[in-house]
Structure formats: C-alpha cells, structure tokens
Amino acid sequence: MSTEEYPFVFQLVSVISGRLLPSTPFISVLSASLPPGSMTGAPKKRSCELLRHIEGSNAPRGLYSGVIGYFDVGGGADFSVVIRSAFRWRSEGFWRNGAGGAITALSKVDEEWEEMRAKREAVLQVLQGGSSLP
C-alpha cells in the first residue's frame, strides 16, 4: 500500500495480486471483490447489508463505486475503482458527481461529511471551469 498526495486529498493505493485455479473465471473474482471495502467500510459484509437497507436493493449506484479496467490476454488485469468522478448522461442533462468514503464504528458524522466534501471539490472545480486536472 502506498499514499499519493493530491491538492485536496491523500489517496491510499493498493496493488492486489494472487493466483487463481485454472478453472476460476476472472469475472467471478472481480464480481466477488465488489464493491471494494474502501467504498463500503468495515466489516464489509455488514456494511453492504446496511447499504442495501438504506439505499434500497433496487437502487443501483451505476458506475460509481464500480471499476474501470481490463483483463489482458496474458491473464493479467488492471482495474481502478470509480470514486471521485463525474458523469453526464444525455437523457438527464446534468452532471452527477460521485464522492464518498468508508464508514467505520469510529466514524464521526461531521468529519465524514467534510471529508466527502473535500473529495468532491477537485471534480467540482474542473466542472465549473476553475481548475484543470493535474
């Protein structure tokens, strides 16, 4: 794990590697790992249950908190979690700005709210024309 520093936040970066049994489909591994723990909080299983209860079981997050990436022909893969992001669907006519973080038993509501606001600030500045991406 490493830490990357950005103007608004520090980002933890993890590289995960392993070996699969030849009979294991890649997509099964990817599906089993989503949503990532950095998005749900801990313990992950209970956090996911709470999220389904709060958000509704039929309330998809869309691409937010999913991943973008690829499987290569050599058996490798590279994926990035979609967190601080902005999407604009033609049918909606407005931008959706995704930002958030993991909640734990030690979380403080006000501090989590401020952290989420800081995380979305860079994306908002770009959308408002006040900044450019590094």
Question: At which residue positions do the language-model features occur?
Answer:
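Conserved hydrophobic core element of enzyme catalytic domains
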Residues: P7-P134
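Short acidic, Gly/Ser-rich segments with clustered Asp/Glu that frequently serve as metal-coordination loops
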Residues: M1-Y6
